[in-house]
Amino acid sequence: MSHSPQNPSSPIAPGDARLDSASFHRNHEPIWAVLSRWFEDKPGNVLEVGSGSGQHIIEFARNAPHLLWWPSDADERKIESIEAWRRHAKLQNVEAARRLDLCAPDWGLSAADSATLSDLTAIFCANVIHISPWP
């Protein structure tokens, strides 16, 4: 992708729900360089906490089609962006985005999602800690 956003998270184009994150362009390659060694021969489910624009999970799902990726975010605008990226990419190994609130006792998951996500290969999180709310 050659587009470089002006703002930290801006729409790709007017009317397009896909957000384009500056941090994705800066760090998806070095993050994948580390993750790929760990994920290369492991099957299973990977939950991304705080998927933001959705660009990282789409890129990583392309690179690791043997894994089933579960995007999540607490922000509805980000959920919309993740879903727009998912539709655009047409990957079979990316689940629908879940609204996930790590501050909630059950993370706000349905019983079905809780059961599925109790068997994870990994939980991945990047570009979140510095913007997380503190009690």
Can you say where each PLM-predicted feature lies in the sequence?
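Hydrophobic adenine-recognition pocket in adenosine-nucleotide-binding enzymes
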Residues: 128
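Conserved class I S-adenosyl-L-methionine
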Residues: 42-52
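Class I SAM-dependent methyltransferase Rossmann-like catalytic core
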Residues: 2-43
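Short amphipathic alpha-helix with an adjacent loop that forms part of the alpha/beta core around
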Residues: 106-118
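Class I SAM-dependent methyltransferase SAM/SAH-binding core
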Residues: 59-109
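A conserved beta-strand element that flanks and buttresses the S-adenosyl-L-methionine
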Residues: 124
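A short, conserved alpha-helix within the catalytic core of class I
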Residues: 131-135
